């Protein structure tokens, strides 16, 4: 288990957070239960993907956790070699809150790792993403 207080302080001091995110974390200062619930450990990837409350924190759903999780996927793809990186990934978004921001963050991480990204420009149903995966040969 992480030292949640240390992790909270690390996030609070991070340049990666914008002013609103820092304010959100500053607002919970002194609320040990809330700090622990947000920082006791990383959000886990389950059978339905990443699921959590949209808040700032390591155990919450936010753009920083999306980037962190995507880096893990990027590492796996990169370990498979240049062919896997060239095949790349397909990313789409749905109508849920922050879906577009999360899709863009994931695309940025993949691209920064030299992985080809095909991202849909607008909302798409899951079967269309499944089709893209098959169509592009993944």
Range-by-range predicted roles:
Residues 90-138:
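N-terminal small/polar loop signature for handling phosphorylated ligands or for N-terminal nucleophile
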Residues 2-3, 8-106, 135:
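An N-terminal, well-structured beta->alpha segment
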């Amino acid at each position: 288990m992480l030292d949640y207080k240390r992790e909270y302080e690390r996030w609070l001091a991070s340049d990666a957070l914008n002013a609103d995110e820092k304010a959100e974390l500053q607002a919970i200062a002194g609320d040990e239960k809330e700090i622990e619930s947000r920082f006791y450990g990383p959000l886990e990837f389950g059978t339905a993907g990443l699921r959590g409350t949209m808040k700032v924190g390591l155990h919450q759903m936010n753009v920083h956790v999306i980037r962190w999780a995507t880096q893990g996927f990027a590492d796996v793809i990169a370990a498979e070699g240049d062919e896997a990186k060239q095949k790349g990934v397909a990313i789409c978004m749905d109508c849920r809150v922050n879906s577009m921001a999360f899709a863009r963050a994931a695309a940025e991480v993949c691209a920064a790792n030299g992985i080809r990204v095909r991202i849909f420009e607008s909302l798409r149903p899951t079967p269309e993403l499944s089709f893209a995966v098959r169509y592009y040969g993944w």
